[in-house]
């Protein structure tokens, strides 16, 4: 069984929205506001089932539930809500591959950001606060192109 953190149950905040909706920007602001020493940050993108190359071959995007380990997300998010540490997978956006898993302990606040954080009732029940970001599509698309080309090794093609 996962080790439980001492103290009261952490407050779990969810920041969900489409790709490039501003989830990471909002999350970084929350971490600065609440204090890094009080916040655990979890990216739901780490629960992708396939790396970037495999997704291209399968012609599937991370927005498809089958492209993600939803069952493991449910289990891990539930453990975090209970104040228990998890061994979390790591997806590396810079090159679209997976890194070694990391041990994560929940702090006073745990902020979880990603595409499918509210996909199931079980996931939704893990959050104390749920935020869904939906910027205008033309703005979001521009942000996505800029981000993917500058930080994720994509081309404008």
Question: Which ranges hold each PLM region?
Answer:
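Phosphate-binding P-loop
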Residues: 3-10
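P-loop (Walker A) phosphate-binding loop of NTP-binding proteins
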Residues: 18
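Conserved lysine of the Walker
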Residues: 23
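Hydrophobic positions on the alpha1 helix immediately C-terminal to the Walker A/P-loop
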Residues: 26, 30
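Conserved nucleotide-sensing/catalytic segment adjacent to the nucleotide-binding pocket
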Residues: 37-43, 49-96, 109
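ATP-dependent NMP and nucleoside kinases share a basic, alpha-helical "lid"
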Residues: 99-150
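Small-molecule kinase domains that catalyze NTP-dependent phosphoryl transfer to phosphate-bearing small molecules
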Residues: 151-157
């Amino acid at each position: 069984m996962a080790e439980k953190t001492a103290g009261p149950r952490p407050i779990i905040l969810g920041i969900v929205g489409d790709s490039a909706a501003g989830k990471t920007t909002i999350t970084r602001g929350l971490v600065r506001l609440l204090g890094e020493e009080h916040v655990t940050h979890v990216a739901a993108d780490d629960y992708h089932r396939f790396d970037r190359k495999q997704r291209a071959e399968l012609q599937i995007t991370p927005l498809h539930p089958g492209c993600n380990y939803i069952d493991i997300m449910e289990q891990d998010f539930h453990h975090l809500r209970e104040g228990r540490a998890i061994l979390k997978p790591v997806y590396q956006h810079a090159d679209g591959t997976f890194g070694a898993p990391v041990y994560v302990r929940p702090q006073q606040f745990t902020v979880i950001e990603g595409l499918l954080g509210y996909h199931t009732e079980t996931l939704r029940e893990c959050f104390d606060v749920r935020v869904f970001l939906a910027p205008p599509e033309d703005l979001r698309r521009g942000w996505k192109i800029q981000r993917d080309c500058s930080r994720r090794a994509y081309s404008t093609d």
